[in-house]
């Protein structure tokens, strides 16, 4: 019987599986992989904003600031932070002149 068509049905007042090959190592491995996939999917949906922002902005190295005055460094940091803050919302209003 296929994994897709197995249904748990009441058998003698107990819940059980009608298939006889449930102790098959392949079925056990598929179950473990399915559970891990579900856990990873849930974590991805819970933390997607943190995860993808980290990949988008955190892994990029900015330009070298060697020889740049501190005031210009601070201005650059503020621009980078404002770019990250814009990404917080789902919609961004763009005004064309």
Swiss-Prot record:
The Phosphoserine modification is found at 64, 82
* One cellular component (GO) term of this entry: membrane
Q: Where in the cell is it found?
A: Virion membrane; Host apical cell membrane
Lipid link (S-palmitoyl cysteine) located at?
Answer: 50
Q: Where are the transmembrane segments?
A: 23-43
Chain ranges sitting on the Intravirion side read 44-97
**Biological processes per GO annotation:** protein complex oligomerization; symbiont genome entry into host cell via pore formation in plasma membrane; symbiont-mediated suppression of host autophagy
Q: Where are the annotated glycans?
A: 20
Work out whether the entry's keyword set contains Nucleotide-binding.
no
Question: Which stretches of this protein does UniProt put in the Virion surface compartment?
Answer: 1-22
What residues does the record give for site: Seems to be involved in pH gating? 41
Coarsely, its chief localization is virion
Means of activity regulation: The M2 protein from most influenza A strains is inhibited by amantadine and rimantadine, resulting in viral uncoating incapacity. Emergence of amantadine-resistant variants is usually rapid.
The answer to whether the entry has keyword ATP-binding is: no
User: Which keywords does UniProt give here?
Assistant: Disulfide bond, Glycoprotein, Host cell membrane, Host membrane, Host-virus interaction, Hydrogen ion transport, Inhibition of host autophagy by virus, Ion channel, Ion transport, Lipoprotein, Membrane, Palmitate, Phosphoprotein, Signal-anchor, Transmembrane, Transmembrane helix, Transport, Viral ion channel, Virion
**What InterPro entries does the record tag this protein with?**
Flu_M2
Annotated GO molecular function terms are: monoatomic ion channel activity; proton transmembrane transporter activity
Q: Return any one Pfam family short name.
A: Flu_M2
**Site positions for Essential for channel activity, possibly by being protonated during channel activation, and by forming the channel gate and the selective filter:** 37
Q: How does it sit in the membrane?
A: Single-pass type III membrane protein
Let me see what the UniProt entry remarks about domains. Cytoplasmic tail plays an important role in virion assembly and morphogenesis.
State the remark under miscellaneous: When the channel is activated, one or more imidazole moieties of His-37 probably become bi-protonated.
- Stated family: Belongs to the influenza viruses matrix protein M2 family.
Q: How does it assemble?
A: Homotetramer; composed of two disulfide-linked dimers held together by non-covalent interactions. May interact with matrix protein 1.
Briefly state the protein's biological role.
Forms a proton-selective ion channel that is necessary for the efficient release of the viral genome during virus entry. After attaching to the cell surface, the virion enters the cell by endocytosis. Acidification of the endosome triggers M2 ion channel activity.
Stated name of the protein: Matrix protein 2
